[in-house]
Amino acid sequence: MKLLVYAVHDSISVSFGTPLFCFLEGYARRALIDGYADRPGNPGDFVLYELGTYETDDASFHLHKLPSRVCSLAELVEG
């Protein structure tokens, strides 16, 4: 089974959070809202990136050369 790998980038601390392993992009978007909406600061500081995929059959990662931007928290809660 293939899982998508996502992580939230915090532009204030200039770091990525713990990776999220999801079946669909919608789960990652929901995790972004649930995990970061109550944090102080600008919602635009938290951006969701797709990092690649994880194959559960052979436990292998296939990561993108560069993370692919999905959306920011501001786009989800304000738009």
Model-based region annotation:
Residues M1, C22, C71-A74:
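Intrinsic-disorder/low-complexity peptide segments enriched for small residues
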Residues M1-S15:
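Short aromatic-glycine-(Arg/Gly/Cys) micro-motifs in beta-strand/loop hairpins
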Residues S11, E25, T53-Y54:
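Generic structural motif
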Residues L24-Y36:
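Charged, amphipathic alpha-helical segments
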Residues Y36-G79:
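Short, mixed-charge low-complexity intrinsically disordered segments
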